[in-house]
Amino acid sequence: MAIQYKRILLKVSGEALSGPKGTGFDEETIASICAGIKAAHDLGAQIGIVVGGGNFWRGRSSGKMDRMDADKIGMLATVMNALAVKDALRQQGVEAVVMTSSLMPQVAECFTSDKAIAALESGKIVVFGGGTGNPIFSTDTASALRALEISADAMFKATMVDGVYDKDPHKYADAVRYDTLTFTRVLDERLAVMDSTAATLCRDNGLPILVFDLGKPENIAKAVQGEMVGTLVKE
């Protein structure tokens, strides 16, 4: 079956891995998400994944803690999530490897673009942990960076809503969903797609983003085939 996006970077929030529990891991939820990833992989897509850490830690809500230390804790949380996703994929018969932004030789391989691309081309899914390896930068920015480093055709941002809206659809019944947007409009209107650093990276390097609902894991395979399952952002 023909696919539109041969190589993708999938961003999955940490909160998505917690399922109805709201914190930590929910094995059933992770298994469901990974089944959706496997379906896209079975179509022939090469898949890199960046996971957030919000199911364990949110640096911006860390009170009086030093921001640098808080962000480092958050980066470690993403490594835990990356290992959980890798294990869930392997349970479903998919070869996967974790690559981290900082040296953790007893935990995972350290990321280089060459090693990541080689793993993708060999049929493995690569799960990236540790964010960018630097404090301040979000996992959205890490996703944009890794997508560019592996020469992805698109970045898929799997969220808890079915696209980008003009206002919060959970609060406003008259919220309007966009089918397509430009990065310039996203930045000018501060629409809730991702932070401005990540959006600017994608805009300046011609990397499209598809935002869709991870509550329907089958959307990943549909999106790989070019179906409009959410909001497409490109310049």
PLM regions and their residue ranges:
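C-terminal catalytic "cap/lid" subdomain
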Residues: 1-235
